[in-house]
């Protein structure tokens, strides 16, 4: 029996048995959520272990954490702001697109516009002229003045009262205004107000008198020009206006405001400018004149240049007391001299003398022609009077100033009148 069963067992085919062998420590497969939590906890434990190894106090770690949080918040804020800015740009683009989009109404109005342009062409108007019309003129301020006539003495009385809203021509945002008053067409007698420093609303309250017969007054024009004073360069004109005398009713006193207008270009030929200094020592009775330089002199020679030199006359009551002159500078319109001349003038006489400065062009063959002339001292006006007054107010100190040369005949006429 045993042998038979043994033979059957050997003859039968082997039975394959599949057995699943699990490791001893294996558990059931975990869900995805539980796996993530385990991974996070492991990372946390690892991070905390590394953190404990850093040799820093707790407060430092807290500060680092706060800074990190602030950096993250700042980055988020910047990103949000950039996104909002892009949205706004898109909206603007849409609005522009809407404005630029062709409207059927605009197309219908196109014919009318073309018709209007044709009408303008017939009337001679151009687009440039149409654009210039709405432009406002530059505001130069205004001036209040008064006019009256003294029939008994044949005198025109001009009052310069005040100015307002003048433009600022100086660096500090102000101006140093004064007013010139003269009659056209002669322009021989000019008056100037005092300079008011650093103001755009000066109050003058000055009156000037012109000796003019009433029969001749109708053919004259009164000019009032406001200037900005500058010691070391040419004075800038702010604005002016003209009053034809034949339009004024002299039956009563005229007092009114007038807006200043842009000044017309000077028709008179420019003769140039000269710079000289004045110094007076009262105790010694010594007046020193230093001729420094001249510029932009009138061309007197054929070659377009000049040979300028300067004469200085000390005068009193129309008489020449002393005469000096500089060296001649050849072939130049901008000569530099820096030559000093002294005059003895007692203190009691300094208010009565005049210093007349004349620039001449030297000529070997003919007469030396005068280029221009200016005088300071007794009865001088404007910039010349201010220069003289500054010298007297600052004894022993040289005071330099530029002066505009005037026509010789006009200066001689002023010297003759003001004896």
Swiss-Prot record:
Vesicular compartment residues: 1-57
One GO biological process term: spontaneous neurotransmitter secretion
Transmembrane segments: 58-80
InterPro entries: C2_dom, C2_domain_sf, Synaptotagmin
Disulfide bonds: none
Post-translational events: Glycosylated.
Residue sites binding Ca(2+) 2 per the record: 169-170, 228, 230, 236
Residues involved in Ca(2+) 3 binding: 230, 233-234, 236
List of residues that carry Phosphotyrosine: 227
Cofactor: Ca(2+)
Biased composition (Acidic residues): 117-131
Lipidated sites in chain (S-palmitoyl cysteine): 75-76, 78, 80, 83
Subcellular location: Cytoplasmic vesicle, Secretory vesicle membrane; Cytoplasmic vesicle, Secretory vesicle, Synaptic vesicle membrane; Cytoplasmic vesicle, Secretory vesicle, Chromaffin granule membrane; Cytoplasm
Region (Disordered): 108-139
Modified-residue entries (Phosphoserine), positions: 262, 340, 342
Residue numbers binding Ca(2+) 4: 301, 307, 361, 363
Residue ranges occupied by any C2 domain in the UniProt entry: 139-258, 270-403
Keyword annotations from UniProtKB, A to Z: Calcium, Cytoplasm, Cytoplasmic vesicle, Differentiation, Glycoprotein, Lipoprotein, Membrane, Metal-binding, Palmitate, Phosphoprotein, Repeat, Synapse, Transmembrane, Transmembrane helix
Iron-sulfur found in the keyword field: no
Residues with the Phosphothreonine modification: 126
Family affiliation: Belongs to the synaptotagmin family.
Quaternary structure and interacting proteins, as annotated: Homotetramer. Heterodimer; heterodimerizes with SYT2 in presence of calcium. Interacts with SCAMP5. Interacts with STON2. Forms a complex with SV2B, syntaxin 1 and SNAP25. Interacts with SV2A, SV2B and SV2C. Interacts with RIMS1. Interacts with PRRT2. Interacts with DNAJC5 in a phosphorylation-dependent manner. Interacts (via N-terminus) with RAB3A. Interacts with SYT12. Interacts with calmodulin. Interacts with DNM1 (via C-terminal proline-rich domain (PRD)); this interaction facilitates vesicle fission during clathrin-mediated endocytosis (CME).
Purpose of the protein: Calcium sensor that participates in triggering neurotransmitter release at the synapse. May have a regulatory role in the membrane interactions during trafficking of synaptic vesicles at the active zone of the synapse. It binds acidic phospholipids with a specificity that requires the presence of both an acidic head group and a diacyl backbone. A Ca(2+)-dependent interaction between synaptotagmin and putative receptors for activated protein kinase C has also been reported. It can bind to at least three additional proteins in a Ca(2+)-independent manner; these are neurexins, syntaxin and AP2.
Protein name, per record: Synaptotagmin-1
Organism: Macaca fascicularis
């Amino acid at each position: 029996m045993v042998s038979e069963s043994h033979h059957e067992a050997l003859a039968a085919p082997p039975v394959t048995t599949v057995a699943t062998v699990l490791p001893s420590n294996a558990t059931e497969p975990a869900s995805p959520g539980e796996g993530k939590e385990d991974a996070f906890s492991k990372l946390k434990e690892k991070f905390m272990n590394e953190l404990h190894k850093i040799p820093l106090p707790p407060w430092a770690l807290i500060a680092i954490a706060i800074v990190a949080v602030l950096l993250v918040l700042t980055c988020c804020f910047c990103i949000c702001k950039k996104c909002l800015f892009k949205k706004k740009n898109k909206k603007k683009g849409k609005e522009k697109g809407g404005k630029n989009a062709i409207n059927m109404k605009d197309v219908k109005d196109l014919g009318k516009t073309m018709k209007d342009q044709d009408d303008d062409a017939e009337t001679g108007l151009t687009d440039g002229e149409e654009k210039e019309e709405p432009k406002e003129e530059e505001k130069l301020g205004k001036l209040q003045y008064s006019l009256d006539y003294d029939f008994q003495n044949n005198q025109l009385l001009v009052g310069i009262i005040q100015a307002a809203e003048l433009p600022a021509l100086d660096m500090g945002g102000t101006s140093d205004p004064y007013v010139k008053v003269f009659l056209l067409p002669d322009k021989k007698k000019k008056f100037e107000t005092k300079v008011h420093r650093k103001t755009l609303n000066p109050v003058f309250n000055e009156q000037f008198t012109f000796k003019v017969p009433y029969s001749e007054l109708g053919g004259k024009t009164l000019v009032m020009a406001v200037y900005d004073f500058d010691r070391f360069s040419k004075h800038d004109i702010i604005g002016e206006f003209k009053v034809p005398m034949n339009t004024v009713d002299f039956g009563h006193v005229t007092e009114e405001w007038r807006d200043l207008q842009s000044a017309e270009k000077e028709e008179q030929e420019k003769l140039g400018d000269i710079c000289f200094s004045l110094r007076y020592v009262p105790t010694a009775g010594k007046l020193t004149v230093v001729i420094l330089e001249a510029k932009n002199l009138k061309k007197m020679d054929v070659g377009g240049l000049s040979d300028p030199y300067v004469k200085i006359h000390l005068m009193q009551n129309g008489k020449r007391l002393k005469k000096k002159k500089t060296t001649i500078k050849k072939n130049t319109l901008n000569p530099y001299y820096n030559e000093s001349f002294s005059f003895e003038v007692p203190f009691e006489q300094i208010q009565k003398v005049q210093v007349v400065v004349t620039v001449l062009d030297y000529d070997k063959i003919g007469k030396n022609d005068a280029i221009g002339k200016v005088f300071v001292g007794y009865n001088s006006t404007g910039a010349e009077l201010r220069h003289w007054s500054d010298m007297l107010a600052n004894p022993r100190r040289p005071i330099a100033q530029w002066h505009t040369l005037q026509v010789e005949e006009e200066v001689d006429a002023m010297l003759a009148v003001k004896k």
